[in-house]
From Swiss-Prot:
This protein's name: Adenylosuccinate synthetase
Self-association state and partner proteins as the record states: Homodimer.
UniProt-annotated binding residues for Mg(2+): D36, G63
Keywords per UniProt: Cytoplasm, GTP-binding, Ligase, Magnesium, Metal-binding, Nucleotide-binding, Purine biosynthesis
Protein source organism: Drosophila sechellia
Family: Belongs to the adenylosuccinate synthetase family.
């Protein structure tokens, strides 16, 4: 056999080994709009059949509500899948963690019946820490902006990611290492922030004493999650990733600067967990049957009228994290086409269809136009351009009957089915599930 043939076979063997090294795939649940689409409920439904559920980015600025066995759980840092006692929950390296909030969240949910968390929660040693002074800075920066505030949650997420990007952040693993080194780094990062924000007051010694206690509390949960996840994939374990926030809040692809400080699109899954692209299986886009957003920023289909009020009231549109009323508007197809382009949805879960039950007609945005009437063939890249567009709507007939008790797609009113099919045809993405209520039992399997 010639050397070239041998080399070719050698290459093919190695190449085949690389392409077949994982026995399972990672399925991903991502918000397709501005958040609050109902991702937690979808994750809760899917988590009953998986081995591992992961958070990959964001912090306790996210808010997910899950109803399990009649009990309502609110999660901010913990993955929603933690209610399933058979699966392991992972907080990945891309997440920023405020330890006081994490342990408060654990206590509150344990009081509601969450059990045995110590055996099934894993935290990455590479995840960065959010400190109280990050939160103070967040509030101060928002206050300084006055009427031009970004509407952040003031949870310190942006300042913590800033510390990470400027390479003076502190990771969980450093808290668990030599505490003298941690103390030095902590004093250094405090000094930097005091220099930039002289009005913040940090009792360094008190904070160090507090974090010495947190080191002992968090130690049992901390692992190299990258190694853990790759081993799991090689062994055929099923993994589900729960994206926090949503595509239109992504630091790169969202309505910048009215965005969060992390990548909440598909790229953040890879960098936030240390996974290669070939591990990704299903990408499930969660779409609310109408559109909402919390805080400031452009919102082309917003309804500042009776329709907006009705959606807000019927949908109980109040932020889990901020307690602010959510702004409400019609479903936006150009926005969804854009986020589908970025994320590559393989299927969609449409949520809160029941909120539209009382409407005689329903509008859906189908195109954006420039002021001169010319249709846009792309999603605007600046808020100035987005704020200057006109929206073209399709008007669909409503169904004016309750869908809350329906559990079979074919039993939905014909016009409700048509609404779902319209979304499918516009996006060329199949709708796999439709939600018509709060609990996991209210999710209809379409196919």
């Amino acid at each position: 056999m010639s050397a070239s043939a041998t080399n070719g076979t050698h290459y093919e063997q190695l190449h085949q080994g690389r392409t077949k090294m994982y026995k399972s795939k990672v399925d991903v649940v991502l918000g397709a709009q501005w958040g609050d689409e109902g991702k937690g409920k979808v994750v809760d439904m899917l988590a009953s059949d998986v081995d591992i559920v992961c958070r990959c980015q964001g912090g306790n600025n996210a808010g997910h509500t899950v109803v399990a066995n009649g009990t309502e759980f609110d999660f901010h840092l913990l993955p929603s899948g933690v209610v399933n006692e058979k699966c392991v929950s992972v907080i990945g390296n891309g997440v920023v963690i405020h330890l006081p909030s994490l342990f408060d969240e654990v206590l509150k949910n344990e009081a509601k019946g969450l059990q045995h968390l110590e055996n099934r929660l894993i935290i990455s040693d590479r995840a960065h820490l959010v400190f109280d002074f990050h939160q103070h800075v967040d509030g101060m920066q928002e206050a300084e902006k006055g009427g031009k505030s970004l509407g952040t949650t003031k949870k310190g997420i942006g300042p913590a990611y800033s510390s990470k990007a400027t390479r003076n952040g502190i990771r969980v693993g450093e808290l668990l290492g030599d505490f003298n080194l941690f103390s030095e780094k902590f004093k250094s990062i405090v000094a930097t922030h005091v220099r930039l924000f002289p009005s913040i007051n940090v009792d360094v010694e008190a904070e160090l004493a507090r974090y010495k206690d947190y080191a002992d509390k968090v130690r049992p949960y901390v692992k190299d999650t990258i190694c853990f996840l790759h081993t799991a994939l090689r062994n055929g374990k099923t993994i589900l990733v729960e994206g926090a926030n949503a595509a239109m809040l992504d630091i790169d692809f969202g309505t910048y600067p009215y965005v969060t400080s992390s990548n909440c699109s598909i790229g953040g899954v890879l960098t936030g967990l240390g996974l290669p692209p070939q591990t990704i299986g299903e990408v499930i886009g969660v779409v609310k049957a109408y559109t909402t957003r919390v805080g400031d920023g452009p919102f082309p289909t917003e309804q500042l009228n009776d329709i907006g009020d009705l959606l807000q009231t019927r949908g109980f549109e109040i932020g889990v994290t901020t307690k602010r009323k959510r702004r409400c508007g019609w479903l936006d197809i150009p926005l969804l086409k854009y986020t589908s382009l970025v994320n590559g949805y393989t299927c969609i879960c449409l949520t809160k269809l029941d909120i539209l039950d009382t409407l005689p007609e329903i509008k859906v945005a189908v195109a954006y136009k420039k002021p001169n009437g010319e249709k846009l063939d792309h999603f605007p890249g600046t808020i100035a351009e987005l704020g200057n567009i006109e929206v073209e709507y399709a008007v669909l007939p409503g169904w004016q009957t309750s869908t809350e008790e329906v559990r079979n797609f074919k039993e939905l009113p014909e016009n409700a089915q048509s609404y779902v099919r319209f979304l499918e045809s516009e996006l060329s993405v199949p709708v796999r599930w439709v939600g018509v209520g709060k609990g996991r039992e209210s999710i209809i399997n379409v196919h």
